[in-house]
């Protein structure tokens, strides 16, 4: 049996969950509908690779004077669901767009289409593509950050923490 000092009282096990749910309810987070772009400029389904039709990104440019800092958003979904137009991506690009950031939402090959490390290859290819296109689209490549949610957080970390050659040497390696 577990020592008494390591046991968690049954009421304490549910307290964090209850606090989380109460806080989320207090925020009154209504679903984010697929509303039309309400400012700035949007460029949809820009191809950043040629391995798959899934290799695209959306670019949202603010109304503020360019070049704007760029935030790259990578969607979650456990590597098996969602895309660059997911609810999380819509919430984030709207938040940052309203504060003067350019946002790129990156789509990548899911596990049902390609094996590991395809998603990492795709996100890194998108980052390289975006790094080369700042003048074309009007964002500042010197002020770029990457952010992800769930599986997207893992992919963002891999893109940020691996050198440029890692997962880049063989095109379409994850097929």
Model-derived regions: residue spans:
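Primarily recognizes the serine-hydrolase "nucleophile elbow" in alpha/beta-hydrolase
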Residues: 125-175
